[in-house]
C-alpha cells in the first residue's frame, strides 16, 4: 500500500511541475507529447531493466555463488536461517549466495518478493556471532518483505523521467531564445548544438539534485529494515549487529550495489547523498523504538 501511495504522490508532484513549466514557458502540451513519451521510456526503461536483471547483475558484480546444496555446517546454518526467517516474514524462500569480501556486509535484491536473492560476505560469516548474523539476515529479509527493490525502481523511474523531461524543455526554450532565427509567424526549434549542450548540463545537474530524493528514500528504508529485523529476531541482536559494523572494513562493493547492502560507505560530502544513515543514528532509532511502532 505504501509503495503505491509513494508512486502516486511522486507522480502527482511531477505532473504539477510539468504543468507549471508548460505554463511559464508558453509551450503547448501537444508539442511535448513525443518528449514526454521519450522521457518515460528512458526514465523507467533503465530502472525496470535493472530491476529485472538485478539478481544476475548483483552476483556478477561481487562474484557471488548461489548455494544449491549446503557443503558445510556454515552453509547449512545460513540456508536454515534464511528459510526460517522467510516463513516468519511470509515470503518465499529466496536464493542464498555467498561472496568473498573482507568487509561485513550482505544484500538482498530481486524483481519480486517471491523471486529474490539474499547474499552475505565471507567477512560477515567469519567475523560476526550467529546472533549478529541472524540480525543482518533478518534486515535483508525485511527489505524483501517490504518490497523495497520495487519501490526504489518506481521512485528512480519517476525521478529519471522528471530529470530528462524538464532538462529538455528548458533546453528547448534556451535554444530557441539564444540561437533561433525566427521570422514573424514561423516557429524555430533553435540551435541544435545549444539544445544538446544545455540539455546535457541540466540532466547532469538535475540528476545530482534528484539523487537527494532517492538517497533519502534509501536511508528511510534502512530504518524500517532495521525495525523489521528487530521484530524478527529481537532489538538487542540488531543493535549488536550494527555495533559490530562500526568495526568493519570500509565496504568494497561497487557504488551501484551500496543501496542494497546493510553496510553503506561512510565517506560522503553530505549525509544527503548517503545511501545509509550513520550507524549511530540507526542504533539510536532502534533504542528509541521510533520505527517499531
UniProtKB/Swiss-Prot annotation:
Which GO terms are recorded in the biological process aspect for this UniProt protein?
Answer: proteolysis
Keywords per UniProt: Cell inner membrane, Cell membrane, Hydrolase, Membrane, Metal-binding, Metalloprotease, Protease, Transmembrane, Transmembrane helix, Zinc
Record's Gene Ontology CC terms?
plasma membrane
Provide the family line.
Belongs to the peptidase M48B family.
Describe how the cofactor binds. Answer: Binds 1 zinc ion per subunit.
Q: Does the keyword Transferase apply?
A: no
According to the record, the segments passing through the membrane are 4-24, 32-52, 158-178, 193-213
Catalytic site positions: 140
The record lists its disulfide bonds as: none
List the EC numbers from the record: 3.4.24.-
Matching PANTHER family? PROTEASE HTPX
Alphabetized HAMAP family for the sequence: Pept_M48_protease_HtpX
CDD domains named among the record's database cross-references: M48B_HtpX_like
Q: Where in the cell is it found?
A: Cell inner membrane
Species for this entry:
Cronobacter sakazakii (strain ATCC BAA-894)
Write down the membrane topology: Multi-pass membrane protein
Primary place of residence? membrane
* Name of the protein described by the UniProt record: Protease HtpX
- Superkingdom, natural source: Bacteria
Q: Which residues bind Zn(2+)?
A: 139, 143, 222
UniProt keyword annotation of Metal-binding present: yes
Give GO MF terms, alphabetically: metalloendopeptidase activity; zinc ion binding
- Cofactor(s), names only, from the UniProt record: Zn(2+)
